C-alpha cells in the first residue's frame, strides 16, 4: 500500500518522556515528507496552540496546507494561522454538569475553552507534568465555571493517576453522558469528555476527505484509549511499544520501539520505506 498520510498521537507516542521529539523521529519524519511526500498530522488531546514547539521540531509549525487534529478531534486546523477547518465543541451546560460531578469526586479537572486551558484543584504531580510540558494554563480553586459562560468549550477532562478509580466513575456518570458525550482515557491519568461522535477517528476521516486521500492510504499511530477510534478508522493501525495492551490488541502492528526510542520512525521505516524491522 502506498500510504499518503500519517496521523500520530503526541504524548507517549511521538514524544519521549521529556516531552520532546527524539532525533530518530525527526530524521525519519523529515525524510518521509521530503522524499515521499507523506503528510504528517499531529493528532492530540491538547489544544492546537499548545503544541507549537512540537510542530516546530518536525517542521510543520505555521506551514500552509499542513493540518493538526486537536482536542481529541474537536478541532481540525490548518497550521498556517490556525485557520479552523472543523469545530465540534462541547455544550457549556453539559461541561458544567460534568465539572460539578468531578468536584465531588476528588479529581483535578482540565477545561479547554477559547483556546485556553483552565485547571481546577491541581495536585502536585499534575502541576509538575503541566510545567514540564510548558503548558500555559490558569489554575483555579473556586468550584464554579460560571466565569466560562460565553466561551467556546472544546472538552473537559478528569485527572487522577489511579486509572481504575477514573474508570469506576463511568457507570456513576451514565445518566449524564449516555447518548451525548464521548468518553475516552489517555496518558494513564486522564478521563476525557467530548461531544458524542467527536474523536480522533472522525477527525481523521474528515481531514482525509478534505485532502482527497483515501482512508485506506492513512496510517494512525497511538498508545492509549483516546487513540482507538483513530486506529480503527485508518487504513493501517500502529501501536506504540509502550502502549496499553488493549490498544496493541486491535492494531495491525506494534513497534519494537517505545516512545523514547522512535515509535514514528519505526513505522515510517517499515511501512513507507519497507525496511525489515
Locations of the language-model features?
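A generic "binding-loop/recognition-motif" signal
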Residues: 47, 72, 115, 189, ...
